Amino acid sequence: MTTVRTRIAPSPTGDPHVGTAYIALFNYCFAKQHGGEFILRIEDTDQLRSTRESEQQIFDALRWLGINWSEGPDVGGPHGPYRQSERGDIYQKYAQQLVDLGHAFPCFCTAEELDQMRAEQMARGETPRYDGRALLLSKEEVARRLAAGEPHVIRMKVPTEGVCVVPDMLRGDVEIPWDRMDMQVLMKTDGLPTYFLANVVDDHLMGITHVLRGEEWLPSAPKLILLYEYFGWEQPQLCYMPLLRNPDKSKLSKRKNPTSVTFYERMGFMPEAMLNYLGRMGWSMPDEREKFSLQEMVDNFDLSRVSLGGPIFDIEKLSWLNGQWLRDLPVQEFASRVQTWALNPDYMMKIAPHVQGRVETFSQIAPLAGFFFAGGVNPDAKLFESKKLSGDQVRQLMQLILWKLESLRQWEKDSITATIQAVVESLELKLRDAMPLMFAAITGQASSVSVLDAMEILGPDLTRFRLRQAIDLLGGVSKKENKEWEKLLGAIA
């Protein structure tokens, strides 16, 4: 009997997302329920955005939750390397195999040519897609351009008629017309693969038997199925999990809710409660009880109990469930966990240099730096009253800073400072008028340690969370303002 092997394959391009943890949990439970193996693979082919720091955060977040893997970049295994950036030669080999078999082809189109192609198609009312012009090149022309070292990508051929039947473990057979599929790029000009080629090659070579992924990937499933067919490989069984959603039913995103696992760890949530809550996202125990452990979920796991309705990720409900877990702890363990959370040595070492020179006794630390250990800070609305800025200007400033910080790739003091400075200058304001407002939003106080240092230490999710709280305190942002201010956002350097 074949051993069940599942995997999670996140991209290390930002904070570890609760959606990644959710999909990892269901893959883990499915594998363990069947006595199988759960694998961690890192999809880091986006070299511009991928970082080892983000990769380590993924490791830390999953381990904090209690989701462990038997093979991966940090523990090794018989099917490595487990970072896609280290498997380039493997992908080159299989991309060339597809070309040799006539299932893929080199495309020499420049970005300008592709832009013009799409513009012309849109002008005709057509769906923009690659038109296959490289297929018209003669073999001699292709060989000449390849020999000359001309930059090119490798694209896959796709049928233009009929439908692809996608066998989904939750929905049954799903029919998707082939004419919705583009001639997907498989290998980029830099020699690295796109998601589609790397995904299929890795899953095959690593012996993955079942793939549980988010339903956002269902529309592109025919490309993966076609690649398995082209290679002559047996494809894994596919399961497309319902997406996590905000309380307003929109797709879960950091613009409306904190989405980083690290945020919830920093807020003092228990990993058991977090896993418990993620386990209830579209799934339920046979006896319908709300509180259960990871092992209990594994023991009772059955995909037939997954509901296709979009599960709502609600922080208030998560907080309620976390309270159930906290109150069930023995008092001694409760005290121990509080100490571990509040007096984390690494975190304290980040804070200490900014506090030590400002206090005369230890008792003065809490009033000065207590905000480092809080979730929200609930500032007094009077702290946002400005002699130079109107109430609308304050809200606009805070909202634009929040949006710009959401796209910040490197969370460091210098980049945070530059971001705030850029917003302030774009609104023709003075930094000295803006910073007291940031103090109020981030620390809940009129003054404290450097707010820029504090933002760096608190991290992106807690910082953004507090900015959102401040904006809500001041009345929020209307749909009209949201639309108008987003136009300003694009002009900020």
UniProtKB/Swiss-Prot annotation:
This is Glutamate--tRNA ligase. GO terms for biological process: glutamyl-tRNA aminoacylation. NCBIfam families: gltX_bact. GO terms for molecular function: ATP binding; glutamate-tRNA ligase activity; tRNA binding; zinc ion binding. It catalyses: tRNA(Glu) + L-glutamate + ATP = L-glutamyl-tRNA(Glu) + AMP + diphosphate. InterPro entries: aa-tRNA-synth_I_cd-bd, aa-tRNA-synth_I_codon-bd_sub2, aa-tRNA-synth_I_CS, aa_tRNA-synth_I_cd-bd_sf, Glu-tRNA-ligase_bac/mito, Glu/Gln-tRNA-synth, Glu/Gln-tRNA-synth_Ib_cat-dom, GluQ/Sye. The keyword Membrane does not apply. Gene3D superfamilies: 1.10.10.350, HUPs (3.40.50.620). Transmembrane segments: none annotated. A motif ('KMSKS' region) lies at residues 251-255. Its main location: cytoplasm. Catalyzes the attachment of glutamate to tRNA(Glu) in a two-step reaction: glutamate is first activated by ATP to form Glu-AMP and then transferred to the acceptor end of tRNA(Glu). A motif ('HIGH' region) lies at residues 10-20. Monomer. Keywords: Aminoacyl-tRNA synthetase, ATP-binding, Cytoplasm, Ligase, Nucleotide-binding, Protein biosynthesis. It is found in: Cytoplasm. It is an enzyme of class 6 (ligase).
